[in-house]
Amino acid sequence: MLVPQTLTAARALLAGEDPGLPLAAGYPHADSLDALRMQVQHGGPDDGGWFVTLAADGRVVGDCGTFGPPGDDGRVEIGYGLAAPFRGQGIGTEAVAALVEHLVGEPGVRVVTASVEVGNEPSRRLLERLGFSLTDGPAGTDRHWHLELGVGAQGFVDGGND
Protein backbone atom coordinates (compact mmCIF):
# COMPACT_ATOMS: atom_id res chain seq x y z
CA MET A 1 0.00 0.00 0.00
CA LEU A 2 1.34 3.45 -0.90
CA VAL A 3 0.94 6.46 1.39
CA PRO A 4 2.02 9.89 0.11
CA GLN A 5 5.19 11.28 1.67
CA THR A 6 4.75 14.81 2.94
CA LEU A 7 7.42 17.39 3.61
CA THR A 8 6.37 17.30 7.27
CA ALA A 9 6.97 13.55 7.50
CA ALA A 10 10.25 13.84 5.56
CA ARG A 11 11.53 16.55 7.88
CA ALA A 12 10.51 14.54 10.94
CA LEU A 13 12.33 11.41 9.74
CA LEU A 14 15.47 13.39 8.94
CA ALA A 15 15.37 14.93 12.41
CA GLY A 16 14.91 11.52 14.03
CA GLU A 17 11.40 12.46 15.12
CA ASP A 18 8.05 10.68 14.79
CA PRO A 19 6.71 11.13 11.24
CA GLY A 20 3.18 10.21 12.30
CA LEU A 21 3.37 6.70 10.82
CA PRO A 22 4.62 3.49 12.44
CA LEU A 23 8.05 2.48 11.15
CA ALA A 24 9.23 -1.09 10.64
CA ALA A 25 12.63 -2.23 11.83
CA GLY A 26 15.26 -1.22 9.28
CA TYR A 27 13.38 1.80 7.96
CA PRO A 28 14.49 4.38 7.05
CA HIS A 29 17.59 2.96 5.38
CA ALA A 30 20.46 5.04 3.93
CA ASP A 31 18.96 5.33 0.43
CA SER A 32 15.64 6.45 1.93
CA LEU A 33 17.36 9.16 3.93
CA ASP A 34 19.11 10.39 0.77
CA ALA A 35 15.77 10.57 -1.07
CA LEU A 36 14.12 12.36 1.84
CA ARG A 37 16.95 14.93 1.90
CA MET A 38 16.43 15.58 -1.81
CA GLN A 39 12.69 15.97 -1.24
CA VAL A 40 13.21 18.51 1.53
CA GLN A 41 15.86 20.46 -0.40
CA HIS A 42 14.19 20.54 -3.82
CA GLY A 43 10.56 19.53 -3.56
CA GLY A 44 7.33 21.32 -2.94
CA PRO A 45 4.62 20.07 -0.60
CA ASP A 46 3.23 17.70 -3.22
CA ASP A 47 6.52 16.62 -4.79
CA GLY A 48 7.23 13.78 -2.41
CA GLY A 49 7.34 10.13 -3.13
CA TRP A 50 5.37 7.43 -1.44
CA PHE A 51 5.86 5.41 1.71
CA VAL A 52 5.44 1.67 1.15
CA THR A 53 3.36 0.33 4.03
CA LEU A 54 2.20 -3.10 5.10
CA ALA A 55 -1.53 -3.61 4.58
CA ALA A 56 -1.76 -5.62 7.81
CA ASP A 57 -0.56 -2.96 10.23
CA GLY A 58 0.41 0.18 8.31
CA ARG A 59 4.11 0.04 9.19
CA VAL A 60 6.39 1.83 6.74
CA VAL A 61 8.80 -0.70 5.21
CA GLY A 62 10.12 1.29 2.26
CA ASP A 63 9.53 4.04 -0.22
CA CYS A 64 9.24 4.75 -3.92
CA GLY A 65 8.78 7.71 -6.19
CA THR A 66 10.05 9.62 -9.19
CA PHE A 67 13.18 11.67 -9.73
CA GLY A 68 11.23 14.73 -10.83
CA PRO A 69 8.52 15.37 -13.41
CA PRO A 70 8.49 13.77 -16.86
CA GLY A 71 10.84 15.23 -19.46
CA ASP A 72 9.72 16.67 -22.77
CA ASP A 73 10.02 13.15 -24.18
CA GLY A 74 7.47 11.82 -21.66
CA ARG A 75 10.05 9.83 -19.70
CA VAL A 76 10.03 9.73 -15.91
CA GLU A 77 12.56 7.82 -13.80
CA ILE A 78 11.46 5.91 -10.72
CA GLY A 79 13.33 4.68 -7.69
CA TYR A 80 12.30 2.28 -4.94
CA GLY A 81 13.66 0.50 -1.91
CA LEU A 82 12.62 -1.63 1.04
CA ALA A 83 14.07 -2.26 4.46
CA ALA A 84 16.11 -5.48 4.30
CA PRO A 85 13.75 -7.66 6.40
CA PHE A 86 10.92 -7.05 3.91
CA ARG A 87 12.70 -7.85 0.66
CA GLY A 88 11.87 -10.97 -1.33
CA GLN A 89 8.22 -11.09 -0.26
CA GLY A 90 6.58 -9.44 -3.28
CA ILE A 91 6.09 -6.14 -1.44
CA GLY A 92 8.43 -4.28 -3.79
CA THR A 93 6.67 -5.64 -6.87
CA GLU A 94 3.29 -4.54 -5.50
CA ALA A 95 4.65 -1.10 -4.62
CA VAL A 96 6.27 -0.47 -8.00
CA ALA A 97 3.14 -1.72 -9.79
CA ALA A 98 1.04 0.72 -7.75
CA LEU A 99 3.48 3.54 -8.52
CA VAL A 100 3.32 2.79 -12.26
CA GLU A 101 -0.49 2.65 -12.10
CA HIS A 102 -0.41 6.10 -10.51
CA LEU A 103 1.92 7.39 -13.23
CA VAL A 104 -0.40 6.12 -15.97
CA GLY A 105 -2.82 8.87 -14.95
CA GLU A 106 -0.21 11.63 -14.75
CA PRO A 107 -0.14 14.16 -17.61
CA GLY A 108 2.82 13.84 -19.94
CA VAL A 109 4.05 10.45 -18.73
CA ARG A 110 4.55 8.02 -21.61
CA VAL A 111 7.59 6.00 -20.52
CA VAL A 112 8.68 4.92 -17.04
CA THR A 113 12.40 4.26 -16.60
CA ALA A 114 14.52 2.75 -13.83
CA SER A 115 18.25 2.30 -13.26
CA VAL A 116 19.48 -0.83 -11.50
CA GLU A 117 22.99 -1.60 -10.35
CA VAL A 118 24.61 -4.47 -12.21
CA GLY A 119 24.24 -7.54 -10.01
CA ASN A 120 21.02 -6.43 -8.30
CA GLU A 121 19.12 -9.50 -9.46
CA PRO A 122 16.04 -9.02 -7.23
CA SER A 123 15.45 -5.56 -8.69
CA ARG A 124 16.05 -6.84 -12.23
CA ARG A 125 13.48 -9.61 -11.70
CA LEU A 126 10.99 -7.13 -10.22
CA LEU A 127 11.18 -4.92 -13.31
CA GLU A 128 10.93 -7.89 -15.67
CA ARG A 129 7.82 -9.17 -13.84
CA LEU A 130 6.19 -5.79 -14.42
CA GLY A 131 7.00 -5.77 -18.14
CA PHE A 132 10.01 -3.44 -18.18
CA SER A 133 12.58 -4.00 -20.95
CA LEU A 134 16.33 -3.60 -20.75
CA THR A 135 17.37 -0.44 -22.60
CA ASP A 136 21.10 -1.00 -22.58
CA GLY A 137 23.67 -3.64 -21.73
CA PRO A 138 25.92 -4.08 -18.72
CA ALA A 139 28.40 -1.28 -19.50
CA GLY A 140 29.06 0.82 -16.42
CA THR A 141 27.61 0.23 -12.99
CA ASP A 142 23.91 0.55 -13.86
CA ARG A 143 21.53 -1.06 -16.30
CA HIS A 144 18.66 1.04 -17.58
CA TRP A 145 15.12 -0.26 -17.98
CA HIS A 146 11.99 1.21 -19.53
CA LEU A 147 8.27 0.55 -19.73
CA GLU A 148 6.18 2.19 -22.43
CA LEU A 149 2.74 2.90 -21.04
CA GLY A 150 -0.21 1.81 -23.11
CA VAL A 151 1.85 -0.39 -25.46
CA GLY A 152 1.03 -3.85 -24.17
CA ALA A 153 2.45 -3.04 -20.75
CA GLN A 154 1.39 -5.79 -18.39
CA GLY A 155 -1.81 -4.49 -16.77
CA PHE A 156 -0.92 -0.85 -17.39
CA VAL A 157 -3.38 0.82 -19.73
CA ASP A 158 -2.74 4.33 -21.01
CA GLY A 159 -5.21 6.85 -19.67
CA GLY A 160 -6.71 5.13 -16.65
CA ASN A 161 -6.29 3.03 -13.58
CA ASP A 162 -8.66 0.23 -14.58
Question: Model segments located where?
Answer:
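Conserved hydrophobic beta-strand within the GNAT/NAT acetyltransferase core sheet
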Residues: 111-116
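GNAT-family acyltransferases
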Residues: 1-77, 82-85, 101-102, 106, ...
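Residues that form or flank phosphate/diphosphate-binding pockets in enzymes
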Residues: 73, 90, 122
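Short glycine-rich hinge loops at helix-strand junctions in the catalytic core
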Residues: 90, 107-108, 131
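Conserved active-site alpha-helix within GNAT-family acetyltransferase domains
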Residues: 93, 118-136
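Conserved acetyl-CoA pyrophosphate-binding loop and the N-cap/start of the following alpha-helix
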Residues: 86, 90-99
